[in-house]
Curated annotation (Swiss-Prot):
Protein name: Acetylglutamate kinase
Pathways involved: Amino-acid biosynthesis; L-arginine biosynthesis; N(2)-acetyl-L-ornithine from L-glutamate: step 2/4
Protein's organism: Mannheimia succiniciproducens (strain KCTC 0769BP / MBEL55E)
GO cellular component labels: cytoplasm
Marked site: Transition state stabilizer: K7, K216
Classification via InterPro entries: AceGlu_kinase-like_sf, AcgluKinase_fam, ArgB, Asp/Glu/Uridylate_kinase, NAGK-NC
Keywords carried by this UniProt record: Amino-acid biosynthesis, Arginine biosynthesis, ATP-binding, Cytoplasm, Kinase, Nucleotide-binding, Transferase
Gene: argB
Enzyme superclass (EC): transferase
Taxonomy, superkingdom: Bacteria
């Protein structure tokens, strides 16, 4: 099977029991299957918590975090430090051979500033898969934070969904986006197994998909179009279902290009 990139939402990092469940499922899966796995993560909630403790303002423009030069070191510390090493520690506990990385390591991606008004925020594209191919070939579990470096050597914050998409494109992998939702629900609150672009557009127009779910669905749709394959939105709360998800079954909603 193709490798699988698992994108983790930051809320998971605030939920120790959920992390335990996730890595229990990963360990169980790796004992029974040979599919290479990678994790890509953000950690916005950790950043917000750290900024609050330091009495620093959180600025946003059109819903995107503004990252001024005097805050990028704090954000790097939260994402590439606290968040990444917390996940590495959990994976090590379950003997999963984790390696903590960022998007700049081994020239995995090319980063370009997204919008000067957002400061140290970048978009990334796939660049060099050699490091990941070597790690996966030796049965390591790469855990990659959404921190990048641009051509000028500047540290950059990257949207974690976009980072996961670039990593999946880099190694021709499938992508699963894990969060705290079961998937996309219809007007009767029943889970929809699969959706395509036209169906998503209609559900948004009908106000069935609203608010934060629009962001999640559009991120998955963007990824599906880039990867030219279905991208799953699923919940990390059900460890008994995660092993099936990692094996390719739909437990949430599959977003097709």
């Amino acid at each position: 099977m193709k490798p699988l990139v698992i994108k983790l939402g930051g809320v998971l990092l605030d939920t120790p029991a959920a992390m335990e469940n996730l890595f229990t499922a990963l360990a169980d899966y790796q004992q029974n299957f040979a599919r290479p796995l990678l994790i890509v993560h953000g950690g916005g909630c950790l950043v917000d918590d750290l900024m609050k403790r330091l009495n620093l303002p959180v600025q946003k423009k059109n819903g995107l975090r503004v990252t001024p030069a005097d805050q990028i070191d704090i954000i790097v510390g939260a994402l590439a430090g606290i968040a990444n090493k917390t996940l590495v520690a959990q994976a090590a506990k379950f003997k999963l051979n984790p390696v903590g990385l960022c998007l700049a390591d081994g020239n995995l991606t090319q980063a370009t500033q997204f919008d000067p008004e957002l400061g140290h925020v970048a978009m990334v594209v796939a660049k060099n898969p050699a490091l990941l191919n070597n790690l996966l070939g030796d049965a390591f579990l790469p855990i990659i934070s959404s921190i990048a470096v641009d051509d000028n050597g500047l540290l950059m914050n990257v949207n974690a969904d976009q980072a996961a998409t670039a990593i999946a494109a880099l190694i021709n992998a499938d992508l699963v986006m894990l969060s705290d939702v079961d998937g996309v629900l219809d007007a009767n609150k029943q889970r929809l197994t699969e959706l395509n672009s036209a169906q998503i557009e209609q559900l948004i127009e009908d106000k069935v998909i609203t608010d934060g779910m629009i962001v999640k669905v559009n991120a998955a749709l963007d990824a599906a179009k880039i990867l030219n394959c279905g991208v799953d939105i699923a919940n990390w709360k059900y460890p008994e279902k995660l092993t099936a998800l990692f094996a390719g079954e739909i437990i949430g909603t599959r977003i097709n290009p």
